[in-house]
């Protein structure tokens, strides 16, 4: 172990850190006030957007005073975390790319978020990141590329699986093929149900190749208890699977072909009989 001839006292180190934090917050406060002056806002309730990009910010003051803030630009700074957005429930677009953010704790307070850019940061924990974003039901556009967590195997499918509402991930549209692959890889139970229905088989709700415990067998309704025109239905333990199976059974197939009874014969066309009906299409719907 190397010996430092001039050790810095612990109290002095803490004082320096506190002093640096205060200086960073003062710089952030000045940047916010400058933006308010530029936009001519006199009341916090009038602030709908803030441009704080490229300000060399390492910390940001609490922005909860801006209740109606909807658009926030903080890209190209030196931020390490997100602790300044606790009551900005109206925020819909947040630009945090090109920083040094290593955790995003605090984003789950933003239920209205629609666009979130986090590329070019230092995010490493993919599970913690997904956990923080799961509650954002309105999130449609997300960017996480150029983060260490992108090196995980099947990273993109993992994000799509846990955030099914996202439509544009890392500047690429989420495709139906990716969604099917995601179900096959991460949701074995639902994939098994889909395959069973597709091939006319019965659904075994207790099937789960990765289950660490023994599941209860699927309950069955007595055969003499009828529902509408169906008898002996399978009751699934998971309500989501029950809804999924029901939606699959409601699929409708429509077949369209020419109604040849309405097509005039060659003789009829030759004689040009009056009252000859024009050819019609015949549509058959199967449920």
From Swiss-Prot:
Q: Look up the signal peptide feature and give its range.
A: none
Q: Does this entry carry the keyword Oxidoreductase?
A: no
According to the entry, every stretch annotated as the LRRCT domain falls at 147-185
Question: Out of the domains of life, which is the source?
Answer: Eukaryota
Q: Note the PROSITE patterns from the entry.
A: LRR
SUPFAM superfamilies registered for this protein in UniProt: L domain-like
What name goes with this protein? Answer: Leucine-rich repeat-containing protein 72
Q: What organism is recorded for this protein? A: Homo sapiens
